[in-house]
Amino acid sequence: MRFYIGLMAALMLTSVLRTDSASVGQTGTKSELAVIERVIRQRDAADVKPVARQNEGPGRDPAPCCQHPIETCCRR
C-alpha cells in the first residue's frame, strides 16, 4: 500500500514540475535566452578537440591546432 501511495505522489510531483517548466519556457525573456545561448556557447567551446597539423616548411614537426572560429596554433 505504501508503494502505491509513493508512486502516486511521485507521478503527481513530476506532472507539477512538467507544467511549471513548460510555463517558464513559454514566458522566457530575452535575458533568459541570452543566458541559455551563453551556456551553449561555453559547452561547445569545451568540446573543442585539438587536431595535429603539419607546419609548412622542411624539418618542422606537427603542432597541435585548435578547431576554433579563430584558429590558434601553438608549439608543443
UniProtKB/Swiss-Prot annotation:
Signal peptide: 1-22
Record key words, sorted: Disulfide bond, Hydroxylation, Ion channel impairing toxin, Neurotoxin, Secreted, Signal, Toxin
Domain of life, per lineage: Eukaryota
Modifications after synthesis and translation: Contains 2 disulfide bonds that can be either 'C1-C3, C2-C4' or 'C1-C4, C2-C3', since these disulfide connectivities have been observed for conotoxins with cysteine framework V (for examples, see AC P0DQQ7 and AC P81755).
Tissue localization of expression: Expressed by the venom duct.
GO CC terms in record: extracellular region
Propeptide residues per the UniProt entry: 23-42
Secreted in keyword set: yes
Residues with the 4-hydroxyproline modification: 50, 58, 62, 64
Localization in the cell: Secreted
One function term, GO molecular function aspect: toxin activity
Function: Probable neurotoxin with unknown target. Possibly targets ion channels.
Similarity section: Belongs to the conotoxin T superfamily.
Record remark on domains: The cysteine framework is V (CC-CC).
Protein name as catalogued: Conotoxin Cal5a L3
Taxonomic placement: Eukaryota, Metazoa, Spiralia, Lophotrochozoa, Mollusca
